[in-house]
């Protein structure tokens, strides 16, 4: 009986989702950041800054499956650890 109970406990632990979930920063505005828990398949955090007008940049960021493409006047950084997209 103890063996059956131990087997059930081990099987339960193995069947649980013990995967790691990445957390990224989202940039709501220039000074306000919140966190976002990434969905399955989104294994990158990105930060994107682009010029609104000369001397001012607007931030964007969050979770992504692939690093976003860079366009002119834009800075894009991607990383793979929690809250790394400052």
Swiss-Prot record:
Task: Give the signal peptide range.
Answer: 1-21
Q: Which UniProt keywords apply?
A: Disulfide bond, G-protein coupled acetylcholine receptor impairing toxin, G-protein coupled receptor impairing toxin, Neurotoxin, Postsynaptic neurotoxin, Secreted, Signal, Toxin
Q: Where in the cell is it found?
A: Secreted
Cellular component per GO, a single term: extracellular region
Which cysteines does the record link by disulfide bonds?
Answer: 24-45, 38-63, 67-78, 79-84
The organs and tissues expressing this protein are described as:
Expressed by the venom gland.
Tell me, what is one Gene Ontology molecular-function annotation carried by this entry?
toxin activity
What InterPro entries does the annotation carry?
Snake_3FTx (IPR003571), Snake_toxin-like_sf (IPR045860), Snake_toxin_con_site (IPR018354), Toxin_cobra-type (IPR054131)
Q: How does it assemble?
A: Monomer.
Question: Its family?
Answer: Belongs to the three-finger toxin family. Short-chain subfamily. Aminergic toxin sub-subfamily.
Task of the protein: Binds to the muscarinic acetylcholine receptor (CHRM).
> What's the name of the protein?
Muscarinic toxin MTX6
| Organism this protein belongs to | Ophiophagus hannah
């Amino acid at each position: 009986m103890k063996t059956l109970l131990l087997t059930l406990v081990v099987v339960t632990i193995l069947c649980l989702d013990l995967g790691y979930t990445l957390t990224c920063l989202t940039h709501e505005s220039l000074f306000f950041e919140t966190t976002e828990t990434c969905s399955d398949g989104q294994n990158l955090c990105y930060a994107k800054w682009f010029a609104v007008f000369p001397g001012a940049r607007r931030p964007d960021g969050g979770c992504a499956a692939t690093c976003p493409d860079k366009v002119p006047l834009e800075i894009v950084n991607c990383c793979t650890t929690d809250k790394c997209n400052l």
